[in-house]
């Protein structure tokens, strides 16, 4: 049996562009893609912190070091420049490997530059 687990997350990045008439996808600064272990054309789930929208698209490379997060195509209707997004990717993990699985969790500053990398989500407490 396989389980679908969080593989990668880029937490609270700021939308820098919305390109309605681009053919689709989400362009992500190549530095962030590498840090999160997300490859070009990989399916990503995007959750808009500001308006609650959730959508699925695929990642493409944005200019390295630019901080670019460009929501493109019809998905551009689901975000505005300045909106905070969480970008996640998932993987199928064999049951035997679940306990050892560690996601890549990338945290950024307000210029979308990586400031922290973690490999677990802390337990939520009251």
Swiss-Prot record:
Keywords recorded for this protein, A-Z: Autocatalytic cleavage, Cytoplasm, Decarboxylase, Lyase, Pantothenate biosynthesis, Pyruvate, Schiff base, Zymogen
Purpose of the protein: Catalyzes the pyruvoyl-dependent decarboxylation of aspartate to produce beta-alanine.
Quaternary data: Heterooctamer of four alpha and four beta subunits.
EC number: 4.1.1.11
Gene, per the UniProt record: panD
Alphabetized NCBIfam families for the sequence: panD (TIGR00223)
UniProt xrefs under CDD domains: Asp_decarbox (cd06919)
Family: Belongs to the PanD family.
GO MF annotation, one: aspartate 1-decarboxylase activity
Gene Ontology cellular component terms for the protein in this record: cytosol
Location of this chain's protein in the cell: Cytoplasm
Catalysed reaction, written as an equation: L-aspartate + H(+) = beta-alanine + CO2
Species per Swiss-Prot/TrEMBL record: Acidovorax ebreus (strain TPSY)
HAMAP family attached to this UniProt entry: PanD (MF_00446)
Residues holding substrate: 57, 73-75
Pfam entry (one): Asp_decarbox
Record's protein name: Aspartate 1-decarboxylase
Main location as per UniProt: cytoplasm
Cofactor binding annotation: Binds 1 pyruvoyl group covalently per subunit.
Pathway(s) the chain acts in: Cofactor biosynthesis; (R)-pantothenate biosynthesis; beta-alanine from L-aspartate: step 1/1
């Amino acid at each position: 049996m396989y389980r679908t687990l969080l593989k990668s997350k880029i937490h609270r990045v700021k939308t820098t562009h919305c390109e309605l008439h681009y053919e689709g996808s989400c362009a992500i600064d190549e530095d962030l893609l590498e840090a999160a272990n997300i490859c070009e054309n990989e399916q990503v789930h995007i959750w808009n912190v500001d308006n609650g929208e959730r959508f699925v698209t695929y990642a493409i490379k944005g200019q390295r070091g630019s901080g670019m997060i460009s929501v493109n195509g019809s998905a551009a209707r689901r975000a505005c420049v300045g909106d905070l997004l969480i970008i996640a990717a998932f993987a199928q993990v064999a049951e035997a490997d679940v306990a050892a699985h560690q996601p890549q969790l990338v945290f950024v500053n307000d210029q979308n530059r990586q400031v922290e990398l973690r490999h677990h989500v802390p337990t939520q407490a009251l």
